[in-house]
Swiss-Prot record:
Family named by the database record: Belongs to the purine/pyrimidine phosphoribosyltransferase family.
Cellular-component GO terms for this entry: cytoplasm
Pathway involvement of the protein, from the record: Purine metabolism; AMP biosynthesis via salvage pathway; AMP from adenine: step 1/1
Record field: transmembrane: none
Species of origin: Dinoroseobacter shibae (strain DSM 16493 / NCIMB 14021 / DFL 12)
Subcellular locations according to the entry: Cytoplasm
Catalytic activity from the UniProt record: AMP + diphosphate = 5-phospho-alpha-D-ribose 1-diphosphate + adenine
Subunit structure: Homodimer.
HAMAP family reported in the protein's UniProt record: Aden_phosphoribosyltr
Protein name: Adenine phosphoribosyltransferase
Function: Catalyzes a salvage reaction resulting in the formation of AMP, that is energically less costly than de novo synthesis.
UniProt entry tagged with the keyword Zinc-finger: no
GO MF terms held by the record: adenine binding; adenine phosphoribosyltransferase activity; AMP binding
SUPFAM superfamilies, A to Z: PRTase-like
Length: 179
């Protein structure tokens, strides 16, 4: 009998990508496997089944894949949070700090109505900078982030702590500590 795969078994680790010393967690192998992908989407939803959610927001780019699937399961709308300059029409922007500089994410200025309840989804929680910027955009439009769901948490990088200090609920399916 073949041992049952865990979610981590579906995630490929690629050493020294995109830079030497980085252990890249490649979730495309999980997305390519129908069973693994289904398990991931179901588990991302699990803590939120009894929570009223009006929309799901996904962070570029793999958060679009996960967030779209989660929104479909919930029968709610999906809102992409994109890198600067990628959305047509009127947008609002939020800068965030990277290790060596800064970046910007945007959403359409009419993406949320005041009072809407939003679940933020992405594949990876590292430093939390991108997620925090996404939360700030959602809140600037008057919506409420009811939680954040990630496939992977890299706790050594402090993202969970950052989001929890914002009183944000964080749900991650697996973590990779210093490996």
């Amino acid at each position: 009998m073949t041992p049952r795969k865990t979610l981590r078994d579906y995630i490929r680790t690629i050493p020294d990508f995109p830079h030497e010393g980085i252990m890249f967690r490649d979730v495309t192998t999980l997305f390519a496997d129908p069973r693994g992908f289904r398990i991931a989407v179901d588990q991302l939803l699990d803590p939120f089944v009894d929570v009223k959610i009006d929309k799901v927001a996904g962070l570029e780019a793999r958060g679009f894949i996960l967030g779209g699937a989660v929104a479909h399961q919930l029968s709610v709308g999906f809102v992409p949070i994109r890198k600067k300059g990628k959305l047509p029409g009127k947008t609002i922007a939020q800068d965030y700090v990277l290790e060596y500089g800064k970046a910007t994410v945007e959403i359409h200025d009419d993406a949320f109505q005041p009072g809407e309840r939003v679940l933020l989804v992405d594949d990876l929680l590292a430093t939390g900078g991108t997620a925090r910027a996404g939360i700030q955009l959602i809140e600037r439009l008057g919506a409420e982030v009811v939680g954040c769901a990630f496939l992977i948490d890299l706790p050594d990088l402090g993202g969970r702590k950052l989001l929890e200090e914002m009183d944000m609920g964080v749900h991650a399916l697996t973590s990779f500590d210093g490996d």
